[in-house]
Structure formats: structure tokens, C-alpha cells
UniProtKB/Swiss-Prot annotation:
Stated role: May play a role in DNA repair. It seems to be involved in an RecBC-independent recombinational process of DNA repair. It may act with RecF and RecO.
UniProt-recorded name of the protein: Recombination protein RecR
Pfam families: RecR_C, RecR_HhH, RecR_ZnF, Toprim_4
Every Toprim domain range: 87-182
The family this protein is said to belong to: Belongs to the RecR family.
Residue ranges crossing the lipid bilayer per the database entry: none
NCBIfam families assigned: recR
GO biological process: DNA recombination; DNA repair
Record's keyword terms, sorted: DNA damage, DNA recombination, DNA repair, Metal-binding, Zinc, Zinc-finger
UniProt gene name: recR
Residues in C4-type zinc fingers: 64-79
Annotated GO MF terms: DNA binding; zinc ion binding
Amino acid sequence: MTVHPDHYLIAAPVARLIEEFARLPGIGPKTASRLTFYLLRAEPKQAQALAQAILDVKAQVGYCRRCFNITVDELCPICRDPSRDQTKICVVEEPLDVLAIERTGAYRGLYHVLHGHIAPLEGIYREDLKIDELIARVRSEPVNEVILATNPNTEGEATAFLLLRDLAPLGVRVTRPARGLPTGGDLEWADPETLGSALEGRREL
């Protein structure tokens, strides 16, 4: 990927860093260039701290063996917390969605992170998500409600429909956050009040 058509004017290490930044989601060529030139002006220790933080995340952070949220231990803090309601599992697409829901203070159950959504056009199918692991949890844990908090967009609705089909034979209550979240949006961008109200007013499927 070449970000600059006049890349021959830019030193190779600079061009490479611009291209690496531009690979990140939500960062276009202009932002990638600004970040790169900011780091060029920064003190060496600041650039070293950034590089070390990236390496530390990759080396130290993994996924909870129970819910697949991010963690530095075998189990995440939520799964280790005995005060959480063990009878409820809130299913979300990404770890960022867990953070968004936790900020509301409206939910005290457990989570299950799918790490994506059904999107055949993008080559993402059922087997690419943590769905079998969710079904295994519902079968083996004292769960009486599964909240399908996938994003309120086409992919999220399709994923929720598939999950409902898979959960139906297990005899567990399946709910979805109430209408009120912006259609087509992501949970991580919803304000805490709106998201909290949607969770408290969740509807049965």
C-alpha cells in the first residue's frame, strides 16, 4: 500500500511508518502522516515508550478462557468477581462493547465476547465467532438469561438471529436491549444513559 504518490520525496523509514499507521482502523493517510511527523518531533523517550507499550500489549494481554474478554490473567476480572450475577450472560461483539456496558453501571452479570459478527460478504461465518463456546457455557453454567447485545445494525441483527436459533433448544431466556439505540451504530459509541436504559428495558425474543 502506497500512501503518498510522491513517496520518493519521503525518507523510506518515514514512508514505512506512515503506511503502518494507515493500516490501523479509522486512520487515513492524512492522520497517519500527522502521527508520523509528530513522532519525528517528539523526544526519543516518548517514541520508545510508545513502542514499548505496543510490545507489552502484544506480549502480556490475551483473552479470558471463559468469556474471551481481554485479560492479563487466565480469567478476566469480571469472571473472577464472585459478586457478579452468574445466571446472566451478555453477548457482545467486541471487548470495547464490554467497556461501554460497564460504564453504564446498569448490568452486573457476566459477558461473552464473540470477536466479530456474521458478515458473509466479508468472509466471516459462524465458525469464525465464539458461538460454540457460548453454547457450551449455557449448557454447563447456571445461566437463565442470555442478553444478545450485538450492534443494532444489519450484521448485528443477523448475528442475534443466528444466536437465537442456536439458543432456543436450550430452554434459556433470550433477550435483546430495548429499541432506543441508534440504528446502524456500534454499542461503543452509545452514551451511557441510552445504553443503560436499553439494557434495563430489554425485551424477550
